Amino acid sequence: MKRRTAAQALIAAGLAPAAFAQGGPVEGRQYARLAQPLQGAAGRIEVVEFFFYMCPHCNVFDPLLEAWAHQLPADVSLRRVPVGVTLMHKLHQRMFYALEAMGALTPQVHAGIFNAFHRAGIEANDEAAIVALVSKLGVDPVKFKAAFNAFGVQAKLGQGAALAQAAGVDTVPALVVAGRWRTGPSMAGTPGQSEVAQGQQALAVADFLVKQARSGKTS
């Protein structure tokens, strides 16, 4: 909860860096246009975050993103897609999708997983450890195990990997806006900035791109 409150306070206080003073974000610098647009949510401007739980940069960015998501207008939606290549990453992807399928992936549980890995030093590198972790976060372990091993969850892994590849994601965290543009803290930020400042820059770029999508602009 403290992670969320601090991030919301930063945004509410207007402490995001005064970036793009010279006319706004620039394509090829702060964001990239996808070679092939991706299909998004019908009737909405969809922002997709690509991340993985063990990523320290994703851990810094997550509370900023969550606070930003709470302020989104009705025509904008946020979707998270966990990615990764190692066996542990894939286990964590299954954890995410199992919780999502159960309707148990609340902001508190999502933040609790990050905190467990990055603050408590928990290493959930097998199914038993993952079940123990989500149980501590208030999730029914029996229902979770059933969801964790369901075919639909396994299929989601392949879909997420295909989406990340189609979006050209090669680093995380990354944001894809309206299926047309990709940005992220490492791209939107500048050398020497803190990771929090870079994350705020990325969200400022996302806001810019949402406006572009809403106005019908494609570049």
Where are the regions a protein language model picked out?
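Periplasmic c-type cytochrome electron-transfer domains
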Residues: G24-L34, I122-E127, V196-A206
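Polar helix-capping/helix-linker motif
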Residues: F20, D126, N149-A150
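C-terminal cap of thioredoxin/glutaredoxin-like
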Residues: K136-S219
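Solvent-exposed loop/turn segments at secondary-structure junctions
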Residues: Y53-H57, G84-M88, A116-A120, G152-V153, ...
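Structural microenvironment flanking redox-active thiols in thiol-disulfide oxidoreductases
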Residues: L72-F96, T106-V134
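Extracytoplasmic/secreted proteins, especially bacterial periplasmic and envelope-associated proteins
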Residues: E46-E49, V60, L64-A67, K90-R94, ...
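Extracytoplasmic thiol/disulfide redox context detector
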Residues: K2-K90, D207-S219
